[in-house]
Amino acid sequence: MSGVVALGHASSWGAALVRISPYTFSAIGIAISIGVSVLGAAWGIYITGSSLIGAAIEAPRITSKNLISVIFCEAVAIYGVIVAIILQTKLESVPSSKMYDAESLRAGYAIFASGIIVGFANLVCGLCVGIIGSSCALSDAQNSTLFVKILVIEIFGSALGLFGVIVGIIMSAQATWPTK
């Protein structure tokens, strides 16, 4: 009976997560930060671009001024790259004897959580900016006075990505590796 309990404890998720190197969590967090941010930017560019091309057939004058929506989507990818660079500078060398100390695990988890926060905030931001950019292109093709009004809404949608970057930077401040 005690063998079953010991086996159950050894195979628990908590025990498995503690055995994974904090550097692995850090690397996954950095990859999620940049990868998911670029995915959000690409998705937003796709949504905006397809509507812009379709609406430009009817009203060619909207093409150049509605490219700002694509630039807002590209900014989302840049947010992810910037945070990935910041997170990478948080990595430090730790002696193998202190690799699984609580401080090392906390640093690895903090970088991982920061990457997840930034990545998925930028994914949502890219979708938001893409949908609003699509609406901006379609409405501008019908009524050119709506462009500036919808552009203001797009700026507020872009703030979602900035909020994610701010929270990610604050979260990454918790990543302190043990000293030698």
UniProtKB/Swiss-Prot annotation:
Which InterPro entries does UniProt cross-reference here?
Answer: ATPase_proteolipid_c-like_dom, ATPase_proteolipid_csu, F/V-ATP_Csub_sf
Cellular localization per UniProt: Endoplasmic reticulum membrane; Golgi apparatus membrane
Chain ranges sitting on the Cytoplasmic side read 48-66, 132-149
Recorded GO molecular functions are: proton-transporting ATPase activity, rotational mechanism
Q: Which SUPFAM superfamilies match?
A: F1F0 ATP synthase subunit C (SSF81333)
* Lumenal topological domain residue ranges: 1-26, 88-110, 171-180
Which tissues show it? Answer: Preferentially expressed in roots.
Which pairs of Cys residues are joined through disulfide bonds in the record? Answer: none
Site positions (Essential for proton translocation): 74
**Signal peptide from the UniProt entry:** none
Q: Which GO terms describe its cellular component?
A: endoplasmic reticulum membrane; Golgi membrane; proton-transporting V-type ATPase, V0 domain
Record's keyword terms, sorted? Endoplasmic reticulum, Golgi apparatus, Hydrogen ion transport, Ion transport, Membrane, Transmembrane, Transmembrane helix, Transport
What protein family is recorded?
Belongs to the V-ATPase proteolipid subunit family.
- UniProt subunit comment: V-ATPase is a heteromultimeric enzyme composed of a peripheral catalytic V1 complex (components A to H) attached to an integral membrane V0 proton pore complex (components: a, c, c'', d and e). The proteolipid components c and c'' are present as a hexameric ring that forms the proton-conducting pore.
According to UniProt, the name of this protein is V-type proton ATPase subunit c''1
Q: What is the lineage of its organism?
A: Eukaryota, Viridiplantae, Streptophyta, Embryophyta, Tracheophyta
